[in-house]
C-alpha cells in the first residue's frame, strides 16, 4: 500500500519506512521560522541553545514597522536573539522585510520534500512548494528551535485533481472559495493538489491556494512538484532537496475532481469562509467602506498586477478606502518597476509597506464600528480586521479592485473580456 505526499515527507523526516493515518511522527525540522510575535513572551530571552542556526529564519511581519512600544520591544528581542545565536537569516525592517510566508516563498526557504514549522497558523502556505509545513504553538516552536524536532499526528488525505484552465478574471482565491463552499471544513485531514490543470496555475496562484488551506482546518496542504516549481526553487536556493510524489497506489480518504474552466468569481459572506460562498450577483451593490488587497494569501506580484489592470485609468469611488499591501518589499519593488504601484496610486489607492497590517487588525487599515470591507486576504471572522461590528466580505483581488471602483461589491468580469487576467 503506497503513501501520499504528506505521508512520504513525514516518513522520511522521521526515519521511518512508512507512516499511516493515526500514527504520531517525530520528525526532523528542515526550517523553523520565527516572527516578531514569537518574541513577545519573555521566555525567548532565556533560551540557552539553538539546535542549528542555519535552519532558523526570523521575520518581522505582524507588527512591522512597529506600531507600539511592545512591538518595538519584541523586535529588539528578536534582533538580540539572532545576534546571540548567529542566525543570519534575519528579515528586519528594511529592504528584506515582508510577511513571513511571502518571504519564505520569495527566498525558496521551503524546500520540496522537507518539513517546515512556524508559529503562525498560515504556515501551510509553504505547501505550494511540496513542503510539509505547519503552524505550531509556542512550546512546540521552542522545541523545534532548540532540538530540531517536531511531532505530528498523521491524518487522512483528501486529494484534489484539477483539469482545465481558469477563465479570465477567475483566480486561485475563487478555487478556494469553491472548495470551502462546496466541501466545507477538512478537520484533521491533509489536502493535496495535482492533476493536469495544476500546470495552468502560476506559482503565486498555488501559494494563495496553499495559504488558504488553514481556513479549511487542514493539517497539511501540499502541491505535487512539477518542472515549474522545481525550477523556481533551484533558481533561488542552492540547497539539495528530494521532492515527494504520491505513490500510484496511495490511499486517500476521498479523491475529488475540479474542472477549473467551470469556475466563476465568488464572495464569502461575513464571519466565515467555510460553507459561506455565494455568487457575486447575490451581494452585488452592497456598499463598502474599505477594499483591501494583501496578506500572505494575496500580496503577490500577480495579485498587484490584476489590481492594477482593473483600476488602470479609473478612480476609486469617493468615500471608499482602497488599501494595497505587497507581501514583501521585494514584491513592492517589482510592482514599482512594472508600473503597478503608480497605476494603483493614480487610481486613489494607498499602498503600504509589506506587513500583516490590516489583515490582522493591527494597523494600516483597521476597521471601525459598523464598517463594511471587502478583502482579498486570509480571514473574515468577526473582529478580525478591527471592530467586532464591522462586516468583512472575502473575494479575489480582481473582485476587490472592481468593488473599490464601484464603492460597492461588483463583478470583475467586464475588466477581463477578450484578454487574459
Q: What function would you assign to each model-found segment?
A:
Residues 1-421:
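Fe-S-dependent hydro-lyases/dehydratases of central metabolism
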